[in-house]
């Protein structure tokens, strides 16, 4: 059912997808779908949680495989995230839905709230990475973490959005490492990312 929901959301967007269409795509009755999920938002939340759990498991594995301190691990996990985004169909479709097909409308308010809840969780994780990098002296102790988090999210989200929406498709595998390198260099060195 989750894969059917992913496919249907990917094709039609969230606002234009009905539970009936998802049930048909899954080859089950609408009643069977309601047995597991009370509404479309509940299904989207379960899908979001499942994919986020998978991403977290991949990040944990990446961290285990990486050499160096937490800052090097952060770089390694970001590189692997973008590799998976380009090569894994489920990741691709899920992020495509989030960035291009999660309409910000009144009828989609519950879905947007779910997405924001998960964004807040990732914001906390990025803040924890920055805190550890400061403690390990990989980053300056006067790092403005709030601005740094905004900078990281803007860079990563901007790269993802640009890749999905670009008419001239670029090679994410070649571009992402360079953008990540520039971002991390700025986090390490740029004076505007220091507390005033």
Predicted regions and their residues:
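Helix-turn-helix
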Residues: 4-42, 46, 50
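Hydrophobic alpha-helical connector segments
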Residues: 46, 60-93, 145-152, 192-193
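Secondary-structure edge/capping motif, primarily at the C-terminal ends of alpha-helices
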Residues: 62, 66, 99-102, 106, ...
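Amphipathic alpha-helical packing segments from all-alpha helical-bundle domains
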Residues: 53-56, 60-61, 68, 72, ...
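Hydrophobic/aromatic residues within well-ordered alpha-helical segments
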Residues: 40, 47, 51, 55, ...
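C-terminal peripheral helix-coil segments that are non-catalytic and often amphipathic
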Residues: 76-84, 120-136, 150-196
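Short coil/turn segments at alpha/beta junctions that flank glycine-rich nucleotide-binding fingerprints
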Residues: 11-15, 66, 88, 136-137
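Amphipathic alpha-helical segments used for helix-helix packing
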Residues: 73, 86-113
């Amino acid at each position: 059912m989750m894969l059917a929901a992913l496919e249907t959301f990917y094709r039609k967007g969230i606002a234009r997808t009905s539970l009936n269409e998802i049930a048909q795509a899954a080859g089950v009755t609408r009643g069977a779908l309601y047995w597991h999920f009370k509404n479309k938002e509940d299904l989207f939340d379960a899908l979001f949680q499942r994919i986020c759990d998978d991403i977290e498991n991949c990040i944990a594995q990446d961290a285990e495989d990486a050499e160096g301190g937490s800052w090097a691990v952060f770089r390694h996990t970001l590189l692997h995230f973008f590799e998976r985004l380009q090569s894994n169909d489920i990741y691709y479709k899920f992020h495509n839905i989030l960035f291009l097909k999660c309409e910000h409308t009144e009828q989609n308010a519950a879905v947007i709230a779910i997405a924001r809840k998960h964004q807040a969780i990732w914001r906390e994780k990025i803040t924890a990475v920055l805190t550890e990098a400061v403690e390990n002296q990989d980053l300056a102790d006067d790092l403005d973490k709030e601005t740094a988090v905004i900078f990281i999210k803007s860079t990563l989200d901007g790269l993802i959005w640009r890749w999905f929406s670009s008419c001239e498709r670029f090679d994410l595998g070649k571009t992402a490492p360079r953008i990540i390198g520039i971002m991390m260099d700025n986090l390490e060195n740029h004076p505007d990312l220091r507390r005033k």
